[in-house]
Amino acid sequence: MNLMTTITGVVLAGGKARRMGGVDKGLLDLNGKPLWQHVADALMTQLSHVVVNANRHQEIYQAGGLKVIEDSLADYPGPLAGMLSVMQQEAGEWFLFCPCDTPYIPHDLAARLNHQRKDAPVVWVHDGERDHPTIAMVNRAIEPLLLEYLQAGERRVMAFMRLAGGHAVDFSDHKDAFVNVNTPEELARWQEKR
C-alpha cells in the first residue's frame, strides 16, 4: 500500500482542554508555531492528505490551509467522536489520528503502524510504558461499530480500540515522541527543552 496516498492524516483538535483552563490546546504556541501545526507538518511528511478535526476556532485552523471537520455529535463527546466525524466526511479507507498536543511524533509513525498492523482494523502506539490510543491507524470498516458505541453513550477510547479488534504497536524506542502537553507548566518546560 502506498502510504502517502492511501492514508488520511488527522490532527485531533476538538477537545475541551479542561486541564489547560479551556484554552484551545491546538492553538498554543510552541517555539513560534501552534501545537496543531507541528503535528500537521509531521503528518504531511508521511502522508499526502491531512485534515484537522476541530470544534472551536475553525477559521483559525482553516487559515492553515487544511480542511477542518467539526464533530457530527454534539457536546464534545471526545476523541472517538472526532474520529467518527472524519470517517463520515472523508473518503479514505485508512486514517492516521494524532492529537494536537503531540508535536514530536516520529517521522516513521505511519510506516511502522502500517507494517505492524497485520490484519487488524485498528492499531495504536504503545511507548513501552503506556498506551496512546488516540495515536492510531484506523480502517473505515470500524465506522458502524464506532457509531453504535458512541450512540450507546460510551466514550472510552482504549475500550473501543480493543472491542474493534485492534492491538498496540511498540514504539518504546521513541518514548519521548509521545509525551503530550496537558498543562501550561508542561508547555513551558517544552519551550525550554527544544
From Swiss-Prot:
* Record localization: Cytoplasm
| Enzyme Commission code(s) on record | 2.7.7.77
Instruction: Mention one GO molecular function.
Output: GTP binding
Give me the residues that bind Mg(2+), please. 101
Which transformation does this protein catalyse, written as a reaction?
A: Mo-molybdopterin + GTP + H(+) = Mo-molybdopterin guanine dinucleotide + diphosphate
Gene3D superfamilies per record: Spore Coat Polysaccharide Biosynthesis Protein SpsA, Chain A
Role: Transfers a GMP moiety from GTP to Mo-molybdopterin (Mo-MPT) cofactor (Moco or molybdenum cofactor) to form Mo-molybdopterin guanine dinucleotide (Mo-MGD) cofactor.
- What is the name of this protein? Molybdenum cofactor guanylyltransferase
Source organism per entry reads Escherichia coli O157:H7
